[in-house]
Amino acid sequence: MKINPTNSSSLTSTLEKKNLGNITQIIGPVLDVAFPPGKMPNIYNALVVKGRDTAGQQINVTCEVQQLLGNNRVRAVAMSATDGLTRGMEVMDTGAPLSVPVGGTTLGRIFNVLGEPVDNLGPVDTRTTSPIHRSAPAFIQLDTKLSIFETGIKVVDLLAPYRRGGKIGLFGGAGVGKTVLIMELINNIAKAHGGVSVFGGVGERTREGNDLYMEMKESGVINEENIAESKVALVYGQMNEPPGARMRVGLTALTMAEYFRDVNEQDVLLFIDNIFRFVQAGSEVSALLGRMPSAVGYQPTLSTEMGTLQERITSTKEGSITSIQAVYVPADDLTDPAPATTFAHLDATTVLSRGLAAKGIYPAVDPLDSTSTMLQPRIVGEDHYETAQKVKQTLQRYKELQDIIAILGLDELSEEDRLTVARARKIERFLSQPFFVAEVFTGSPGKYVGLSETIRGFRLILSGELDSLPEQAFYLVGNIDEATAKAMNLEMESNSNK
């Protein structure tokens, strides 16, 4: 991280010393540039091409050096379209890697891979910038204590808890509530942990990025009146961008998150949507650079590239970066090298189910498919572990009985199984929860449920103390006291209607 000088004398001296080269070859987003002998830029240095094309249009393209070819030539990958570039154009070596603005000025704004604002809200203070290529924290700086990152979302905290400074994979198709879950997590980390979030849109649809921005403004995650009060910074490198931008936009978002962790000493949530597109962009760049492809056509450096990104996402003694990464699984093949490499880094998985969404149970997190390495008695305690296991057993038994119920009906079940089904249906409904960010759509106030309250509620359902309550009393409530109060209201309503 560096504080940039504002005086003009240092700027003049920099321009006097600038290192200039010329484009010798252009193949799509890849440029070859020749420099004077002894003036070669380093790997990862940013190069800038400025000028005018044949139609007189202004050109400003930033590239990143990827290979030193010999004979004073380097090969660089462009971060924006190379339309209008010609051989012989002048290229300036900036002498440093790409640097992006960091700190509070980034909140509520949308950036591209170069750290330039793209939301038409004016310039951003660039006095404090940080290079996107940095080493992972040293072992001695890491916080190795295993601790739960409480989200206030019942189904997550009980059955697939997140690790503070961990990495979580978010699996789900279109329209099952990924965006709403992401926004609720952004809202809750700001309220409960005083933290901020950074959202990295890597290679996804521009329309989805725009929808997310609009929904964030609507739900108050981005504060339009006072932009500094916003809880999230957005960095987009969408599907229409060249592979260089899609490959590096994840690092831009991570660099902004690292500043909040290391300098502001905050807990940070880093969202990457979609981690598969990061790998896909790396594969495209690898082919353009002429590297021999590996399994299924992926880049030979797949594990290294993934590790370089993932190892920077961690807890230090100053703060933590907890990362939630949407994972696209190509052709639903979990053995594909891209998702398989991602799985090696994940501490928990949150799987969203279309079946639950169809039932109207939101968040539609699948309680049986979602997993977490944190769900161990020595980490979460016996009470939490036992409750979670019993909830899963009850739901699993209900799942097994569903075929029998569909064919023969509930009456054919044994007394014990009927009780299990009744409790499982209550558990299923109690796993739903009203969200703060959905208040504008549903009209019901959002609820943050602490972990101890969550465990107490499920223990009461499992113990049979609440067997007499109707199952609709458990739907879309916060803690168990709200469910019992709702049951009393339902009873009073039914009595008054008689």
UniProtKB/Swiss-Prot annotation:
Produces ATP from ADP in the presence of a proton gradient across the membrane. The catalytic sites are hosted primarily by the beta subunits. Its EC number is 7.1.2.2. GO terms for biological process: proton motive force-driven mitochondrial ATP synthesis. Belongs to the ATPase alpha/beta chains family. Keywords: ATP synthesis, ATP-binding, CF(1), Chloroplast, Hydrogen ion transport, Ion transport, Membrane, Nucleotide-binding, Plastid, Thylakoid, Translocase, Transport. ATP binds at residues 172-179. It is found in: Plastid, Chloroplast thylakoid membrane. It is an enzyme of class 7 (translocase). It comes from the Eukaryota. Its main location: plastid. It catalyses: ATP + H2O + 4 H(+)(in) = ADP + phosphate + 5 H(+)(out). F-type ATPases have 2 components, CF(1) - the catalytic core - and CF(0) - the membrane proton channel. CF(1) has five subunits: alpha(3), beta(3), gamma(1), delta(1), epsilon(1). CF(0) has four main subunits: a(1), b(1), b'(1) and c(9-12). It is a peripheral membrane protein. InterPro entries: AAA+_ATPase, ATP-synt_VA_C, ATP_synth_F1_bsu, ATPase_a/bsu_AS, ATPase_alpha/beta_chains, ATPase_F1/V1/A1_a/bsu_N, ATPase_F1/V1/A1_a/bsu_N_sf, ATPase_F1/V1/A1_a/bsu_nucl-bd. PROSITE patterns: ATPASE_ALPHA_BETA. This is ATP synthase subunit beta, chloroplastic. One of its GO terms (molecular function) is proton-transporting ATP synthase activity, rotational mechanism. Signal peptide: none annotated. Pfam families: ATP-synt_ab (PF00006), ATP-synt_ab_N (PF02874), ATP-synt_VA_C (PF22919). SUPFAM superfamilies: C-terminal domain of alpha and beta subunits of F1 ATP synthase (SSF47917), N-terminal domain of alpha and beta subunits of F1 ATP synthase (SSF50615), P-loop containing nucleoside triphosphate hydrolases (SSF52540). One of its GO terms (cellular component) is mitochondrion.
